[in-house]
Amino acid sequence: MNHAVAVFSPNAVLNKNAVRALVAVQIAIVVLLWVFSPFVLLPKPGEVLSAFSDLWEQGLGAELITSFLLNVQAIAVSTVVSLLLAYATVMPFFRPIVALLSKLRLLSLVGLTFFFTLMARSGHELKLSLLVFSVSVFFVTGMADVINGVPKEMFDLARTLRMGEWRVVWEVIVLGQIDQVFDVLRQNAAMGWMMLTMVEGIVRSEGGVGTVLLDQNHHFRLAAVFAIQLTILLLGLFQDFSIGVAKNMLCPYAALTLERK
């Protein structure tokens, strides 16, 4: 009874078993709503599982590997590029440039695709460049905000310890905010999966799960569409979980001051 009250109490802290039970109940409710949904066009779980089995026999696994590797590559390149640009804002020369780049997140890729096509030397390079651009403009914005939000006291403490300005940058901004890099990465890495369908729809030569999804959607096979979407969701959750595990392993101190861990 105490746990039943606690889940609706503000700032309540539940133990791990209670959290697992709460999640299990909520998942069960979602599944029941799905099974007994009155919407005729909404595929039932059995239909989705059957469609997934058929897609798997047709090579969905290989397409998932292709898309996953492309997304990982795009995230890796985006992370390196965005961090270099964000860290460069410690120098006044680069601040207007990064501010301008961050505003590009408001643009649509429609129209810009033509220019990326002219610059790319292959279909894979075109897909990669589109994904890197889509993720980087958000990533660099988040990291620039993290750097701008570093308290003045941290800089003063480093200077009091007689550190040079480049040492201050290394200790306060690079090492001192490394845990927040994982948070920003976690938030923006999902952008790659959101853009994947469009990117793989533009370049179909290498296949990918986005190509399969577009084909199934074109023929209005809703059960197959749901099966692919749920598979992408599970892959995204695995990616998100992996980034969280990496953060906890490399930055175990990050959660010490948090009330909800």
Where are these regions (language model features)?
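Transmembrane alpha-helices
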Residues: 129, 133, 166-199, 231-234, ...
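Periplasmic/extracellular loop-to-transmembrane helix junction in inner-membrane transport proteins
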Residues: 7-13, 35-77
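Transmembrane alpha-helical segments of polytopic membrane transport and secretion proteins
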Residues: 1-24, 241-261
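Hydrophobic alpha-helical transmembrane segments of polytopic membrane proteins
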Residues: 209-247
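Cytoplasmic-entry segments and transmembrane alpha-helices of multi-pass inner-membrane transporters
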Residues: 84-118, 141-145, 149, 156
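Hydrophobic alpha-helical transmembrane segments of multipass integral membrane proteins
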Residues: 61, 65, 69-85, 89, ...
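Loop-to-helix entry region at the N-terminal start of transmembrane alpha-helices
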Residues: 21-22, 62-70, 118-139, 224-228
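Short cytoplasmic-facing helical segments at TM-TM junctions of multi-pass membrane proteins
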Residues: 142-181, 210-213
